[in-house]
Regions:
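Conserved glycine-rich cofactor-binding loop
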Residues: 15-16
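Short, small/polar-rich loop/turn modules that mediate ligand/substrate recognition or access, typified
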Residues: 168, 173, 229-231
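C-terminal helical subdomain
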Residues: 176, 194-229, 236-238
């Protein structure tokens, strides 16, 4: 799925997880990539990849977003696509969660995406392009104990829709990819635990996804194969959002009825 040969792409949150897998996928498809993450150390793995340039910086800084686009254009040519993937998760419910944590999550997950979007659009506007935002099933449904994360992901999913409406006349497509439980640093604390096992039991496919499975969908969206796809929020979730969440389905399967 996807053909990104010679596409010039920026990817944020490229140091691990979905961002790292996306850079690898795009490099395999012979794209020219600027990979952005918070520290130089998190980008050292890029050294063996051809046509990939790294930039260390904080996506909440407007100058970093401008620099990543300028670096891509100066190094490789006109910008074709942006993958706005950087994000954080802080646990906490509405009663006990702190506003400090809330502000931090919103700053990275929403402000960082908005800044990246504006910078990418400024570079793409003459010729068009594609922007893929990493949302989450937590932007499509609610979770217990993740209030700030839920708000932030709901915001960027709707940002993708709004941007698709605003930018279509410029031939710029904007979509959100909404992963479910994926084996990344955000979920490593649940793996092999009672909570993790319960999460897997509620997934129709019966397992967590891999970052590469999300990267494949992102690579499709950055390619010309998705030329008529915009304003979409695409679940990559093992089927978790296909159901209502009612217990009967899962209990029936466990008892052998389904």
């Amino acid at each position: 799925m996807g053909d990104n040969q010679d596409k010039v792409v920026v990817v944020t949150g490229a140091g691990s997880g979905i961002g790292k897998a996306t850079v690898r996928r795009l490099a395999d498809e012979q794209a020219k990539v600027v990979a952005v993450d918070l520290t130089k150390a998190s980008l050292e793995w890029l050294q063996d990849l051809d046509s990939v340039t790294s930039l260390a910086g904080d996506v909440t800084d407007p100058q970093v977003n401008e620099q990543m686009v300028e670096l891509a254009v100066d190094t490789y040519g006109p910008l074709n696509a942006a993958v706005l993937n950087a994000g954080i998760l802080v646990q906490g419910d509405i009663v006990r969660g702190s506003m400090t944590d809330y502000d931090r999550v919103m700053d990275v997950n929403v402000r960082g995406v908005a800044l990246g979007l504006k910078s990418a659009v400024a570079a793409m506007a003459p010729a068009g392009g594609s922007i893929a935002i990493t949302g989450s099933v937590s932007g499509l449904r609610g979770d217990s104990g993740l209030w700030a994360y839920n708000v932030s992901k709901g915001a960027v999913v709707n940002l993708a829709r709004a941007a698709a409406l605003d930018l279509g006349h410029l031939n710029i497509r904007v979509n959100a990819v909404c992963p479910g439980p994926i084996h990344t640093g955000l979920t490593e604390g649940t793996q092999g635990t009672e909570i993790g096992d319960a999460m897997e039991a509620r997934l129709p496919l019966g397992r967590f996804g891999q970052p590469e499975e999300v990267a494949a969908v992102i690579a499709f969206l950055t390619s010309d194969e998705s030329s008529f796809v915009t304003g979409a929020a695409i679940p990559v979730d093992g089927g978790v959002t296909a159901g209502t969440g009612q217990w009967a389905t899962y209990a029936g399967r466990k008892r052998g009825y389904l």
